[in-house]
């Protein structure tokens, strides 16, 4: 034993791992390779293609179930391909494998049961003729002719049935698989996409087709209340992550056969299913054609959420001003399609996109149509006031304080000067500090668990504001300005539109600090020019106020429901009239009856 090695220090080698660049590596990606490969008639070739497509040797959730089908004393090998967790095992076992492997004796491929039924029918008719032999000769001749026709029809039906089921694929499709949604595919691209969505595929030897069987059964949450767009008076349903559940909600509320739901796949790798929903007899054809064109011409690998799709289909960035309305409420989407708009649903996302959208849509609440017009218009006025306060109040305050002190009453001006006497920082620093602090409290309240989020926001704002005033960092009047601005931002119904106002507020604050009312006026001019230049799917963003004011247009304030006789003309719908001028017919009938 070497004593030196025993006491010798040997440092532990550092383990290092670096990712090497594979940009120029020539690796075949089967998931994005677009081929028109048709299904082989050889079961072994189909099996090898499916295994290579899904990396079967390393994928643990890909299930391939081998079995045999016996038809007309012949044994046909087959296998079922599906993804574990995406399909319903009850459907696969009882309605796919059970009838195929343990088929009923009545489902014979040579259709011998029909022959037996025909023979029984002939025997019954012969017995009846024997019992009625005492009838007149005329009646017997009629019965004989009828019996002859029945036998001929039965024989013809037998021949048609035998001819029909000479094809094994038709026999399996119509006799062996009791499923309400099954199709026959001849190419791999379609069947692979459906398997990824939860279907199962049946491959049978000697057949160059594959049976696409709907067996979806993945878990999903139940229909719940809206999380963001809550209303006191109105429906309490919200969209889910399953696109078919969402389309069924639209179909149930619309209750009309003119509702068209077209499927579109987006993403070369993810192949995310999207649904374009519109009323065929109302929506403008050019709008629908443009929506299809944009959806079908997206060259991306993956699409996960409706927020990503919103960025891809809107006309331009326009400094963050939202151009597509996002909602989680089915009733809001139904009202949109009834006006002539289109709704886009994305699989895996509980939010729908409404196109086109104008500025007034982002200031509207789902509750407006459910309230009395007087109350609804009062709330809409409050939202309009909150819009102006959120955008301009901090900038107006800093402009008046620095440049236009004469606008303040003398007593109020003295109070502001006394409050700011001990503050060592310029007013722009105070304002930006409190604005950023308020945004931090807001984001912290959103990201923390809901049980303590609201408490954190209230306590944090109180402690921070009181400590800032006590330390002479900010003045009390500034705390009031920031608080009113923050409360006004919460009144905006749409989160995206409210966020854009919060960002633009900083720009108006800086302009007010630099040039006072002149800077704010210049900012308003640029902001209005920007709004006027925006279009959402060919519709002016400031419609119905600009560029054309029409008598048919529904303005910002909501008229009574019985006065909403026309749809928005800026949408150019096929059907302009939405209801009769005398929608309350009962009033007219009662008045006529009284006059008589």
Stretches with model-predicted labels:
Residues 387-407:
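Hydrophobic alpha-helical segments embedded in or immediately adjacent to the lipid bilayer
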Residues 1-392, 410, 530-596:
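Membrane-embedded alpha-helical signal segments
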Residues 373, 377, 404, 408, ...:
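Short, contiguous, pocket-lining structural segments
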Residues 396-399, 409-596:
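Generic detector of multi-pass transmembrane helix bundles and their immediately adjacent loops
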């Amino acid at each position: 034993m070497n004593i030196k090695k025993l006491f010798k220090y040997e440092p532990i080698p550092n383990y290092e791992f670096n990712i090497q660049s594979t940009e120029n590596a020539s690796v075949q990606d089967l998931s994005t390779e677009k081929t028109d490969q048709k299904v082989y008639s050889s079961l072994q070739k189909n099996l090898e293609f499916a295994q290579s497509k899904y990396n079967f040797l390393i994928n643990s959730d890909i299930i391939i179930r081998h079995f045999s089908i016996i038809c007309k004393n012949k044994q046909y090998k087959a296998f079922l391909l599906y993804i574990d967790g995406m399909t319903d095992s009850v459907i696969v076992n009882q309605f796919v494998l059970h009838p195929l492997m343990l088929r009923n004796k009545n489902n014979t491929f040579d259709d011998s049961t029909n022959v037996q039924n025909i023979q029984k029918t002939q025997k019954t008719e012969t017995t009846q003729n024997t019992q009625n032999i005492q009838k007149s000769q005329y009646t017997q001749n009629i019965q004989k002719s009828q019996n002859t026709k029945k036998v001929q029809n039965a024989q013809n039906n037998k021949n048609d049935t035998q001819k029909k089921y000479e094809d094994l694929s038709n026999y399996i499709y119509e006799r062996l698989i009791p499923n309400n949604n099954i199709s026959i595919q001849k190419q791999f691209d379609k069947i692979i996409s459906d398997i990824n969505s939860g279907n199962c595929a049946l491959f049978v030897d000697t057949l160059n087709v594959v049976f696409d069987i709907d067996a979806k059964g993945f878990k999903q949450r139940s229909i719940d209340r809206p999380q963001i767009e809550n209303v006191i008076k109105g429906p309490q349903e919200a969209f889910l992550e399953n696109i078919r559940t969402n389309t069924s909600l639209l179909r149930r509320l619309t209750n009309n056969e003119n509702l068209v739901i077209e499927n579109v796949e987006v993403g070369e790798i993810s192949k995310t299913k999207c649904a374009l929903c519109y009323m065929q007899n109302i929506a403008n054809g050019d709008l629908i054609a443009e929506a299809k064109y944009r959806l079908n011409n997206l060259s991306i690998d993956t699409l996960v959420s409706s927020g990503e799709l919103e960025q891809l289909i809107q006309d331009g960035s326009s400094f963050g001003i939202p151009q597509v309305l996002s909602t989680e409420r089915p009733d809001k989407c139904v009202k949109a399609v009834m006006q002539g708009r289109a709704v886009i649903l994305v699989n895996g996302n509980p939010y729908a996109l409404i196109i086109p959208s104008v500025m007034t849509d982002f200031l509207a609440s789902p509750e407006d149509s459910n309230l009395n017009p007087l109350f609804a218009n009062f709330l809409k006025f409050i939202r309009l006031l909150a819009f102006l306060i959120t955008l301009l109040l901090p900038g107006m305050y800093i402009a008046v304080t620095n440049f236009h002190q004469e606008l303040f009453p003398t007593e109020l001006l003295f109070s502001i000067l006394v409050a700011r006497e001990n503050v060592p920082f310029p007013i722009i620093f105070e304002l930006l500090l409190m604005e950023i602090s308020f945004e931090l409290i807001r984001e912290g309240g959103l990201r923390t668990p809901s049980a303590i989020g609201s408490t954190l926001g209230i306590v944090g704002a109180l402690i921070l504001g009181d400590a800032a005033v006590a330390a002479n960092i900010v003045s009390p009047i500034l705390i009031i300005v920031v608080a009113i601005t923050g409360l006004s931002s919460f009144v905006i119904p749409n989160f995206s539109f409210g966020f854009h106002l919060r960002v633009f507020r900083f720009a108006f604050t800086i302009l007010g600090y630099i040039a006072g009312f002149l800077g704010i006026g210049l900012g308003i001019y640029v902001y209005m020019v920007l709004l006027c230049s925006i279009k959402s799917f060919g519709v002016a963003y400031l419609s119905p106020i600009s560029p054309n004011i029409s008598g048919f247009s529904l303005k910002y304030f909501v008229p009574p429901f019985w006065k909403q006789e026309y749809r928005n003309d800026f949408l150019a719908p096929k059907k302009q009239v939405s209801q009769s001028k005398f929608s309350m017919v009962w009033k007219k009938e009662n008045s006529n009856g009284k006059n008589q």
